[in-house]
Amino acid sequence: VNAGAPPAQRNSLGRSLGLGEKLFATPTERRFVAAVDDGLELVEAGLLREIAFADDIADATTRYLLAAGGKRVRPTLTLLIAQLGDGATPGIVASAQATEITHLASLYHDDVMDEAQMRRGVPSAQTVWGNNVAILAGDLLFARASTIVSGLGQEAILLQAETFERLCLGQLHETVGPREGDDPIAHYLDVLADKTGSLISTAARAGVMFSGAPREYLAPVAEFGEKIGIAFQLIDDVIDLSDQPAETGKKAGTDLRAGVVTLPVLYLRQLARTDLEASSLLNEIDRIVDATRAAAQRSDCEPTADDAPAADLAHETSHLDADFADLVRRVREHDVTERTRVEAHRWAREALDALSPLPDGPVKKALTRFADRVVERSA
């Protein structure tokens, strides 16, 4: 590992899922937790080893979001499900690393597409280095993930290719938007399935494929992963409106202000046909999104000798910020946000229903807790 590499992140199943001694109390369950924790340490050490480039710029940019932390949701899921077989085999550890690196790569690209300013509590990569470098850093990470997967055999290569295709299609469909006659909410859920559900489903499938677990568990865990991924993203839509930036790592309403489509906004559009309050909220969202973009364009212009335009811009931005803070509060307190939370819980229940073919035991118990934590989280 390079001298400038970030320290290994300490991940714990007990900490991430709340699997304390009261919840997982039997000797078998405690051994299960310890085995997954050992696997997480191997994955983390491997991430530091794999995300390393001889080129200084490539090394700094690709390690940037790794060093910023992360929940390691996908490796945790792979390692949990691997306990249905032989546990953290070399193939399991490698696949978990590849999936997490793929996820990291997608974050670089997502932040460029969404013009996001913050990620994991730090300025986003394109804010630091610009769009071109951020995109290329993501490409390098995708390439490194593919290198790891190439050592796992033809089935793994095909799975990685299919997942990458779905990630791209999800981003494409999100960018283009629904076609005339499409249901915008159904379109949005399809986008979430491709952009988020596909990779979490891949992580779940890998837990069976590379652990020697019975192949009949592949379809149930794949469905679980896809549906819990949709639930995960819907809760992100709720978290975007949170007034606790210290927990979320970004300003309240980041997606809302950037004009990113979320389920609360889609629900507002649905209601606005007959509801004056929803229509008023939508108009205010559109006004602030347009004003924010206009202010950003003016701030990018060459400065003049006259300080008055800069002072006017700062004054306008201050007013916009105050208006927007009130708008976020109104959307957060509106029924559309609670409806989004309820929809996330529905997807989580469907995900758990898919696990019925799995045997009772610590794996199913941990996956149930995994689903609960996805919809209970605040960051």
Regions found by a protein language model. Give the residues of each.
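All-alpha prenyltransferase/terpene-synthase fold signal
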Residues: 1-379
